[in-house]
Amino acid sequence: MRTVIQRVKYAKVSVDGKILGEINKGLLVLLGITHEDSIKEVKWLVNKTKNLRIFEDEEEKMNLSLEDVKGKALIISQFTLYGNSIKGNRPSFIDAAKPDLAKDLYLKFIEELKSFDIETQEGEFGADMKVELLNDGPVTIIIDTKDANIK
């Protein structure tokens, strides 16, 4: 799994002009899934996401997590995070998971995050979405589970 996590003042996602999800202070999580991913990666990445200390404490140090600040999360599926443009100028997406597996793990990610009582909104898997956000910082963190030793 590969994710781009952005600390936001607000974020919202819409499809065909209809708002599907909207949050204020929290994290916008762009989530890419590859064919090698499983529930192990989901659990590890949810744990990392909810505990990532990228919110400022009273001394303006990034020392607080999403849970600490009672922030919200907006989760957006994004297969293009597995785009490879090393050869040519048109990205290849062969490293992205097939839709059935990707959707299943995407929904499990959302379910797992909600199990920690984190208010979670989501986009529509596979849809052409419009995402609007106001970065806070900006703070943007990229995490790839292949770089972790997940057992």
Curated annotation (Swiss-Prot):
One record GO biological process: tRNA metabolic process
InterPro entries per record: Daa-tRNA_deacyls_DTD, DTD-like_sf
Enzyme Commission no: 3.1.1.96
A molecular function (GO) term: Ser(Gly)-tRNA(Ala) hydrolase activity
Catalytic function, reaction form: glycyl-tRNA(Ala) + H2O = tRNA(Ala) + glycine + H(+); a D-aminoacyl-tRNA + H2O = a tRNA + a D-alpha-amino acid + H(+)
Signal peptide start-end: none
Main location: cytoplasm
Compartments in which it is found: Cytoplasm
A GO cellular component entry from the record: cytoplasm
Alphabetical keyword list: Cytoplasm, Hydrolase, RNA-binding, tRNA-binding
Spans traversing the lipid bilayer: none
Pfam families recorded: Tyr_Deacylase (PF02580)
Sequence motif: Gly-cisPro motif, important for rejection of L-amino acids, positions: 137-138
PANTHER family: D-AMINOACYL-TRNA DEACYLASE 1 (PTHR10472:SF5), D-TYROSYL-TRNA TYR DEACYLASE (PTHR10472)
Job of this protein: An aminoacyl-tRNA editing enzyme that deacylates mischarged D-aminoacyl-tRNAs. Also deacylates mischarged glycyl-tRNA(Ala), protecting cells against glycine mischarging by AlaRS. Acts via tRNA-based rather than protein-based catalysis; rejects L-amino acids rather than detecting D-amino acids in the active site. By recycling D-aminoacyl-tRNA to D-amino acids and free tRNA molecules, this enzyme counteracts the toxicity associated with the formation of D-aminoacyl-tRNA entities in vivo and helps enforce protein L-homochirality.
Comment, domains: A Gly-cisPro motif from one monomer fits into the active site of the other monomer to allow specific chiral rejection of L-amino acids.
Subunit details: Homodimer.
Family membership: Belongs to the DTD family.
Protein name per UniProt: D-aminoacyl-tRNA deacylase
Species name: Fusobacterium nucleatum subsp. nucleatum (strain ATCC 25586 / DSM 15643 / BCRC 10681 / CIP 101130 / JCM 8532 / KCTC 2640 / LMG 13131 / VPI 4355)
